[in-house]
């Protein structure tokens, strides 16, 4: 069997953060949570909820099914404008 859904979500988030050049603090601000909450979810100490997955997909400009398909598909679905090195609008509360 392949990876579990929680692992797939954590890996997709990590891959998207890397591809977009986004920090945990920036992602936390966009989702309205603390950086510590993002860290706990990424370490597996807490789980990403389905509502979180939907918010993450919206934040990264993709369909939630592409996001849930795992890191490879999620990165393929990431819009060019959100990729690292591209100019993207700042996220509410993000410090640049």
Give, region by region, the residue ranges found by the protein language model.
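Residues in the helix-turn-helix
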Residues: 37, 47, 66
């Amino acid at each position: 069997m392949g990876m579990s859904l929680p692992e797939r979500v954590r890996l997709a988030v990590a891959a998207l953060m890397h591809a977009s050049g986004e920090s945990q603090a920036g992602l936390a601000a966009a989702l309205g949570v603390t950086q510590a909450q993002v860290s706990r979810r990424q370490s597996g100490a807490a789980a990403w909820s389905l509502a979180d997955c939907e918010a993450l997909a919206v934040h990264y400009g993709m369909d939630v099914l592409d996001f849930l398909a795992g890191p490879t598909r999620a990165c393929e679905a990431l819009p060019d404008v959100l990729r690292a090195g591209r100019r993207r609008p700042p996220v509410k509360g993000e410090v640049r």
